[in-house]
Amino acid sequence: MFSALAYYLLIYPASLLPLRLMYFFTDFFYLLLISILPYRRKVVRKNLKNSFPEKSEKERRKIERKFYRHLTDLLAEGAKNLSISKKNLKKRFRVENPEVMEELYKKKKSVLLVSGHYNNWEWMITSQNLLFPHQAVGIGMPLSNGFWDKKLNERRARFGMKIIHSKITHDFFKKNKDIIATLVLADQSPGDSNRCYWTSFLNQKTGVLFGPEMLANEYDQAVVYFNIKKVRRGYYSIHLHEITDNPSQLTYGQITEKHTQLLEETIKEEPAFWLWSHKRWKRQVPENLDALRESHEKKFNERFR
């Protein structure tokens, strides 16, 4: 009941305001975040220190402040996403090199679009079906709050994206007849330390979701990394990087290593725009990592090679 009241009486009406006015309110919230209400400050500082040990404390604090500024911008833009028009969204969210996806579509090649929680990923989800010729697909886990899960997915899907539960991903792919582009944010902390792919990421041993590589090989889909760049406040551009259009030609781990490396390069270029408040490194590195990797590689090769 409270969620519905908050949505209909506060959040959705606020989304109808001009974005410039919404930024005025989130600017005030930014001042609260860096002073009175330090949201996950310990997590942010720990992540920055471990990721950039070569930077001085002053440099990391500068990134931290810029991150919180960006985070409050995302609050305004996230609210705006509930009501933003197709025309306005297309004006604010552009693709630098759409020919990458256009060529894959001509080949009737479905695509896994892979990146991380960098810049405004929510606008990417909402606008994807407007940007590329492929049918947009999003994979996600339902939110614990049923009302918000329904409302957010309605907003995300209103321009044509199909939202599917992660548990039915394989059923969906097996039955699918469309040329699709499935968006995957692969920088989330994995649910199981023993089932993910371990590599080096931002100066730390990191467990990475292996799902994109498995899906690419299982269903012979191309893999494209997308980098969302902040042009200016409220405006973004996307640069596409094709990793492969033939995953069977690559060896175990190559796809995962490549999209992880590309995300790291993206973050290092403009560190403040990644989601530093996320507990990315909460999983412990397995003690038998070498044996585990050997076992995973063997199973992968038996299945796909």
Feature map (PLM): residue ranges:
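Membrane-anchoring hydrophobic helices of lipid-metabolizing enzymes
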Residues: 1-115, 150-155, 160, 304-305
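A broad structural signal for alpha-helix termini and local helix breaks/kinks
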Residues: 17, 36-37, 51-53, 132, ...
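Hydrophobic (often cysteine-bearing) scaffold residues that line and stabilize catalytic clefts
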Residues: 60, 144, 148, 255
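A conditional alpha-helix N-cap/helix-loop micro-motif detector
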Residues: 91-94, 118, 145, 165-166, ...
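Amphipathic coiled-coil/heptad-repeat helices and related helical stalk/stem segments
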Residues: 97, 121, 148, 165-169, ...
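Conserved beta-strand termini and adjacent loop/short-helix elements that scaffold enzyme active sites
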Residues: 98, 139-141, 164-167, 241-243, ...
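Catalytic core of membrane glycerolipid acyltransferases/transacylases, capturing the structured
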Residues: 107-167, 191-197
